[in-house]
Amino acid sequence: MLHADDVMAGKMDALYNRAAARDFLDIDAAITVGRYTMDRLCELAETVDAGFDRAIFADMLRHIDRFDDEEFAQYGFAAAEVPALRARVAQWRVGFTPDQLGN
């Protein structure tokens, strides 16, 4: 049986490399329920992907804007909740410190 950390490392890898609408939803759910912080998720991603780069990841988070609200609805996410999702993802992005980004 997989440990939750292993599952979340895979979810972070998916968000980092594929960045599909469902990948944003998976990470948002893990953070929203309080099980993980973005910092912990990045640590997990770094354990499975030696090339994981927080600066690239932070920049990649803006790609959420390429999805229409309806694309999130395919996964049972209410369209009315999408603006709040986008705001949370923006907060993740600005939440990285210069030290975490290698600046």
Q: PLM features: residue spans?
A:
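Compositionally biased terminal segments of proteins
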Residues: M1-N103
